[in-house]
Amino acid sequence: MTNPQSAIRNPQSADGVLIIDKPSDWTSHDVVAKVRKILRTRRVGHTGTLDPFATGVLVICVNRATRLVQFLTGDDKEYLATMRLGFATDTGDLTGEPLLPVTDASHITSEQVQEALTHFRGRIWQTPPMYSAKKVEGVPLHELA
């Protein structure tokens, strides 16, 4: 790719792939916009949108490396989640309105949780929630909800 020294002097000439740990208060588009501003280039793209409240790896391609996006989007993904039992919201995340009062879930064992999680391991088909970054006709679902 680009000579690192010339990229420092002229950020617009930088080509490459950045691995960014997206914070929960940024959208994937916010990250792309920030990279565009710092590197002073419009040719910046990512390999997959993370939901607005999700944190994690966002792969960013810059300039000539944007040609690689098509080869990086089909890779398997791994998710790490934290559960709060006895609590549900209308959005399916912590920002929503509670659907019911918080209930005591202390009777649920770790074995029961592990058994329930088996349904979320491996290759699964999931219907995206309305409060997600999934786009329908170019509009994120969370904006339509």
Predicted regions and their residues:
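Catalytic/RNA-binding core of pseudouridine synthases
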Residues: M1-A145
